């Protein structure tokens, strides 16, 4: 009777596929249980004279699980939601040391500097005890869907990823360089990577007018991993031009009126460092560290000032990987313990992509 039936989670509104005959289902994102009424027990009411329908109730039914995340509370400026993914690939030949540190630092930054409610931040790392918050391919897909689900004008969304990135040959003609950029979930060797086309379809194209999305991507080959139409090409003097990356195939890669900007760790042909040369305490992703430091040191007024500050820090580290004190109060507070393996010079240039060109030195940065 319920074959292929879709229902919405009673708490976070994520669409769920109900198994045949089931009377309830647990949401993989927020863990709330949604109960399904069996309408087959009741005969339809007889036809009656049309009357004016009562006004719809404004009181939402309570969640059956009080401990389930209720979602970000609405306010006059809209809601704030974030998905933060940090993958260390522990005990594998792909292991990274800094990615879970990146995730913890980013969560703290969002809560303390940008007033993101803790309950509106969905963390996916190997340290999570909830199996639905382990950064597998399926869980990452569901988290990205949750991020944009039900968004409304005034909402501010953020996606942060720290982990491996890669690229693969593109065959549909929608990439200027001939390659699709990819993110590597924890189980990518068996389940495959998440391709930029899918990320664009999930969190970029559906975004309605009045909603803002920022992506902070600390991974190799990540310059255009959201497949946004325009890339800001900036030189060492801070001069920039916007490159048009709209595919010749005519496939639309923009939004449904929303505002999307991505700051990524490096260009599509570059690799992104996992290093202890920056924090001097433990390994972090170079890009994540430099982004947080730019905000902490007061360089977060505009997108141009952030990008310049990040690039300067990485260049200085590349020229002098062993010197200089660049530990901010936030990093120093969050990161404890030692790490092995420093880094040589860093060869990467953080990139900015957008759904449309804008003046990076006059547009205020805001999350």
Label each region the model flagged.
Residues 17-19, 36-37:
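Short, non-ligating residues that shape and space the ligands of small metal-coordination modules
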Residues 30-41:
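Short Cys/His-rich micro-motifs in 6-15 aa windows
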